[in-house]
Amino acid sequence: MAKRIGITMRVDNASGHNEPRDCLAQDWANYMANVSPNTFWMPLPNLGEAIADYVQHWQLDGFIFSGGNDLGSCQLRDSTEFTLLNHALRNALPVFGVCRGLQLLQQHANGFLRQCERDVHVANVHPIHLRTDLLEFNAP
């Protein structure tokens, strides 16, 4: 049976509209089709703690925490993603963090985050320094 993966979405304000919108870069569809063609994936709306019922209903098998938005800049997204992470940890589900998503995992593990300049960070390759010991983040 194909795995079902949820991908979190950033929050943006569309030009000309005074309303926040959940969104996901369009290249995610191509990326997922290339790296995991037999996986069903779905974007996850920012619902805060209500996301727990949503993912339970869809019986998702894991989560990708996507990039966009700084931690702490969107309370609803923060609540959604920490709820998802706690659900994943309770149910031994795999998680993967991209940019902000990796920062979320690092913060949850009480790791160090260093602020970087946007023009140096966005759409650029940058180093990630790992500790020498193994951290089994999602171990049951």
Task: Briefly describe each language-model feature range.
Residues 1-96, 100, 107, 111-114, ...:
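N-terminal beta1-alpha1 cap of cysteine-dependent amidohydrolase-like domains
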